[in-house]
């Protein structure tokens, strides 16, 4: 209960940081190209930060890893539980203290990085407030703004497609370590395989930024996210092979980069479209971003629930050196069949997303014309007022 309460508080505080941090994209520039570039830089650094955090956590906590439990076929579930208790008693006095200290040190290091990055963000980033031409005299209430946002068709289609593709990659991410350890038999290699995925994602985000600029965002979504499908199928169809696994890891990282970058890059276009349809509504950018963050947290929880229940029903044995065949089949489904189905469903929903490159250019021109018209009107009013004085 203590852990649950403090973990919920931690997630709440992280969300309170993540929502305004993400929404800052709309306030650092009015140019779509500059916002896309800022999003690419942000996602590159986020993925790089994930790699750094994984490396720090792994190096500190990895030294306190407890051994696996041998579970031969004749060992019953009760005997297996007894074996776990015996090993726990044998290693309890030393391993528990070492593990606690390792996690405390890792938490201190990561917490310090959180504070440092938050200070740099607060001090180093300046907002560009929207000029008066797109602002009404009285702001629209939060609840009316929420209703307008949730009735905006382009936003609903985008977050729905984002929901399914995010769930696919979170299932892959959450179960890939177990898949490498038990199904493929690469117990000593899975950390390097995960590192290959994240490094591949980090290095290919600039490529996807160029690709979406050259060919459009919807095309980039289809090419980028769907590119993982054949490799996810190959990794479970072919026999266990370390080289093929690394190739799949690199390919998955390329697709993960697209899944990280593209939905966040498309969101400012939706907000511009919303502004044109509802010029009287202002200051609701945080609503768009907060529901994006909400769906990220939601898919993370759903992914964890699906994985935990599926593995429990299959007979997963905690800390076992090997697993029943049912667990291996379940892991294959969780890292291949289910993600592929979710990706295809998400891409189908992205097909319904109405803002293509032509529509995006039209919105950009309309917003620019609106600003120029308002600026001209403001200058005329100022000149008239000066003449009167």
Summary of predicted features, one role per range:
Residues 1-8, 12, 16-177, 181-186, ...:
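Intracellular loop-helix junctions on the cytosolic face of multi-pass helical membrane proteins
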Residues 1-7, 15, 236-249, 255-265:
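Helix-loop junctions at membrane interfaces in 12-TM secondary transporters
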Residues 40, 187-195, 290:
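Small-residue hotspots at the loop-to-helix junctions and early N-terminal turns
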Residues 47, 51, 198-206, 261, ...:
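Residue-level signature of mid-helix packing/kink "hotspots" within the transmembrane helices
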Residues 110, 192-201, 296, 342:
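Transmembrane alpha-helical segments of major facilitator superfamily
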Residues 117, 203-219:
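Helix-to-loop junctions at the C-terminal end of transmembrane segments
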Residues 219-234:
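Structural signature of the two symmetry-related core transmembrane helices
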Residues 280-313:
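A late C-terminal transmembrane helix in Major Facilitator Superfamily
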